[in-house]
Amino acid sequence: MVLTLSNQFLAKIPATPKTLTLPKTSSSTLRPQWSCRKSDIHPEFREDAKVYCNGELVMTTGGTQKDYTVEVWSGNHPFYLGNRSALLLDADQVEKFRKKYGELTQIMEIPVLKGEIILPPKKKSKAKKK
């Protein structure tokens, strides 16, 4: 089944604009790269920028700087490590509360309700007269 479109806008194939240039590709790259930016105003992009965490090389990525130094990355972040985290985690909110108000036994004990809880019936609102 062949679909024929009579729309004049879809029938035309746009030519490559003259502002876009296709740089010469080396034999190591398999795909052509378009360059649409002005020359001499952008920083140099490095394909082999190294990322260091605590003085240890953790990854190689692309970027505008030669090396990056980070404090936390996925290899030592508690979210990615779960219980194997090497970082000291802060006490959760309950532990902070117990540490602060631990001597007050009245608020530390949770009351246990006995028997049935009877809620009073809701009062019906008076109908508005018009």
UniProtKB/Swiss-Prot annotation:
One of its GO terms (molecular function) is rRNA binding. The keyword Plastid applies. Residues 1-36 form a transit peptide. SUPFAM superfamilies: L28p-like. GO terms for cellular component: chloroplast; ribonucleoprotein complex; ribosome. It is found in: Plastid, Chloroplast. GO terms for biological process: translation. Gene3D superfamilies: Ribosomal protein L31. Keywords: Chloroplast, Plastid, Ribonucleoprotein, Ribosomal protein, RNA-binding, rRNA-binding, Transit peptide. The keyword Chloroplast applies. InterPro entries: Ribosomal_bL28/bL31-like_sf, Ribosomal_bL31, Ribosomal_bL31_sf. It comes from the Eukaryota. NCBIfam families: L31. Component of the chloroplast large ribosomal subunit (LSU). Mature 70S chloroplast ribosomes of higher plants consist of a small (30S) and a large (50S) subunit. The 30S small subunit contains 1 molecule of ribosomal RNA (16S rRNA) and 24 different proteins. The 50S large subunit contains 3 rRNA molecules (23S, 5S and 4.5S rRNA) and 33 different proteins. PANTHER family: 50S RIBOSOMAL PROTEIN L31, CHLOROPLASTIC (PTHR33280), LARGE RIBOSOMAL SUBUNIT PROTEIN BL31C (PTHR33280:SF1). Component of the chloroplast ribosome (chloro-ribosome), a dedicated translation machinery responsible for the synthesis of chloroplast genome-encoded proteins, including proteins of the transcription and translation machinery and components of the photosynthetic apparatus. Three forms, which differ in pI, are produced, L31 alpha, L31 beta and L31 gamma. Belongs to the bacterial ribosomal protein bL31 family. Type A subfamily. This is Large ribosomal subunit protein bL31c. It comes from Spinacia oleracea (Spinach).
